[in-house]
Amino acid sequence: MKLTISILFCVILTLQYNGADGKLKDLFGKIHDSVHGTADKVKEDLNSLFHPNDKNQQGNNDASSNIHFADSEENTDAAKKPDEVTPATTTTTTAAPAVPNAPSDNPTTLAPSTTTKDGRENFSGGCVAGYMRTPDGRCKPTFYQ
């Protein structure tokens, strides 16, 4: 650990000063450029290895492979203009108006509820997996731990 720190200290100390012949000047810039040049070359090699036909497809100037769009309406047989459609006529009949709040011959009354329920009996949902419904409507686990 001490050796690594001392070597790093010496390298930083020597990189601050320019050498007499200028070899140390812009050392990091040269390393940066060489790494980027190597990375670009590797990228181009991988592209040519996995996609060998990309350059051929980019330079393809065949007239049969080009797509042309029609500019005029003269040659548009595929897209026909829609025919004129007449809308259907609707007839309405008026019925006799109903009299609001008319007295009824049969009076209706609600039958009183004879049983009191707490709501669980009317629950129609199921229980989650591993639970079963009890007679009173609750969900209890099937296996007690």
Curated annotation (Swiss-Prot):
It comes from the Eukaryota. Disulfide bonds join C127-C139. The keyword Repeat does not apply. Changing G126F: Significantly reduces plasmatocyte spreading activity. Induction: By parasitization and low temperatures. InterPro entries: GBP_PSP. Residues 1-22 form the signal peptide. Keywords: Amidation, Cytokine, Disulfide bond, Mitogen, Signal. Residues 23-120 form a propeptide. Changing G125A: No effect on plasmatocyte spreading activity. GO terms for biological process: hemocyte migration; positive regulation of cell division; regulation of synaptic transmission, dopaminergic. Residues 55-67, 104-116 have a biased composition (Polar residues). Residues 85-103 have a biased composition (Low complexity). Pfam families: GBP_PSP. One of its GO terms (cellular component) is extracellular space. Residues 46-145 are annotated as: Disordered. Growth-blocking peptide appears to exist in two different forms, a long form which has been isolated from parasitized larvae and a short form which is found in non-parasitized larvae. The stop codon of the short form may be read as a Tyr to synthesize the long form. Expressed in the hemolymph, perineural cells and neuroglia of larval brain. GO terms for molecular function: cytokine activity; growth factor activity. Changing G125F: Significantly reduces plasmatocyte spreading activity. The modification Glutamine amide is found at Q145. Belongs to the GBP/PSP1/paralytic peptide family. Biogenic peptide that prevents the onset of metamorphosis from larva to pupa. Has repressive activity against juvenile hormone esterase. Induces cell proliferation at low concentrations and inhibits it at high concentrations. Mediates the spreading of plasmatocytes to foreign surfaces. May have a role in the regulation of dopamine concentrations. This is Growth-blocking peptide, long form. It comes from Mythimna separata (Oriental armyworm). The lineage of its organism: Eukaryota, Metazoa, Ecdysozoa, Arthropoda, Hexapoda.
